[in-house]
Amino acid sequence: MAKLSRRLLLAGLAAPVVSRAARAAGVEIHVLSSGSFTAAYQRLAPEFERRSGHRLVSAFGASFGPAPDALPQRLGRGEPADVVLALEDALEALAGAGHLDAGSVTRLAETRVAFAVRTGAPKPDMSTVDAMRAALLAAPSIAYSPSGSGRFYETELVQRLGIAEQVMPKSRRWFPDRIGAVVARGDAAMGLQQISELLPIPGIEVIRIPEEVQKVSFASAALGGKARQPEAARQLMAFLSSPEAAPMIAATGLDPIRR
């Protein structure tokens, strides 16, 4: 059934987005992607390559933070980037640093955060704000990332819940590991990250949080400030933001922007 569903989704991407001439003159498009849109991008990339004739050269890292593979560090070293995929606030910061074309930012999907616990562990109730507060207070350890979701956790969520003093001493920022993997191997009892980043990780259960305290962000795309293939990059961005790509994006836990 999963293979059939995937074939049906790809069948929905049948309409061409580039001309035969463009396919014949394929180029390399360098893409930097943060975790929020990575699963969707990896599913859509082969179809774009097939239809366009271009080849995608991809690298991945966190939207923020000091890790060597984080997007700000990669761009600061001068790594090539025709297209950058990340949360919109990260793209704005990168544009402010001169790494991106600020006027090219294109929203692709809404993304939300969630907690995860190891498969087989007790699944705490987070159906209400009070229940979530109690679950975080009871958790022996909590993992979060240095990227956008982690910044939300340490600067907004626990502050709004009024439990920062109690939970931050038992919370740890992990990098470069994916938070779902940290939880799956038992290094933390609970972890917070974008839903789209948690869903591909085996060995965990995802727990959604109340919308009242949810962090709704935009997974977006932008042209690199020194893009070597700007026209091909725009073709990729048009493909990722097209209605035809929406079903595959939704299948990764994101809410596509409807156009």
Feature locations, PLM:
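N-terminal export signals
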Residues: A2-A24
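Exported/periplasmic ABC-transporter solute-binding proteins
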Residues: A25-D69, G76-P80, D89, A93-G96, ...
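Phosphate-/polyanion-interacting regions in eukaryotic proteins
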Residues: L85
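A short, gly/pro- and small-residue-rich
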Residues: G98-G103
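Short beta-strand
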Residues: T106
